[in-house]
Regions:
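Alpha-helical segment proximal to the catalytic Tyr-Lys
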Residues: 123, 166-167
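Active-site loop-to-helix junction immediately N-terminal to the catalytic Tyr of the SDR YXXXK motif
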Residues: 98, 143-151, 163
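Substrate-binding pocket helix/loop in short-chain dehydrogenase/reductase
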Residues: 94-107
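Conserved NAD(P)H cofactor-binding loop of Rossmann-fold oxidoreductase domains
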Residues: 87-92
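Residue(s) in the substrate-gating loop at a strand-loop-helix junction
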Residues: 137
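Canonical Rossmann dinucleotide-binding motif of NAD(H)/NADP(H)-dependent dehydrogenases/reductases
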Residues: 3-35
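Active-site helix of classical SDR
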Residues: 118, 153, 161
Length: 186
């Protein structure tokens, strides 16, 4: 399949992971310029591994101010965004032993950052008739012993994706999810 994204701008949150790097590679191969947003400084090396068209912005996606600054940087260096891939997540999960703070942190990173980044890029995506791809996981549907936070947050993203798709359709924004099987992502 030959996909042409020449001149389009894509944002990949969580782009410093193995899956994130593969997503960035696919987007670049299709001609897109890509902004990697990740708290992990390894994203810089990933961005530098491409000859051109990829930038890294170290971003704490639990901070609205950091998200808005990242969007401003993207606009300044790459332009308006047509595609958003929400891949950032934490694997913090001690099942039943997880504290309230663990729950709040996991949901903030895995779920709320998806909402806030989508909200911050909404006007671009509407103008560009763009797309959002939210990464869920097989864990959203398959129970795992000792894991509560990650599967619950990924199941919530599945439902969020359906709600976003319905609400954003009238604005020409497509919203879908991808649910990888078991894989190492770091």
């Amino acid at each position: 399949m030959n996909i042409n994204l020449k001149g389009k701008v894509a944002v990949v949150s969580g782009g410093a992971t193995l899956i994130g790097k593969a997503v960035v590679q696919a987007l670049v191969s299709a001609g897109a310029h890509v902004a990697i947003l990740d708290i992990d400084a390894k994203g810089k090396a990933i961005a530098e591994s491409f000859n051109h068209g990829v930038m890294f912005i170290q971003t704490d996606l639990t901070s609205d101010a950091a998200i808005h600054q990242a969007v401003a940087d993207i606009h300044q260096h790459l332009g308006e965004v047509s595609y958003l891939v929400n891949l950032a997540c934490t694997y913090l999960d001690d099942g039943f032993k997880s504290s309230r703070q663990d729950w709040l942190q996991a949901l903030d990173i895995n779920l709320v950052s998806t909402v806030e980044l989508s909200r911050a890029l909404y006007n671009d995506l509407k103008k560009q008739q763009g797309s959002i791809v939210n990464f869920t996981s097989i864990s959203a549907k398959v129970a795992q012993t000792g894991r509560w936070l990650y599967p619950v947050s990924k199941a919530a993203i599945r439902q969020l994706t359906q709600s976003m798709a319905m609400d954003f359709a009238a604005d020409g924004i497509r919203v879908n999810s991808v649910s990888p099987g078991w894989t190492w992502s770091r």
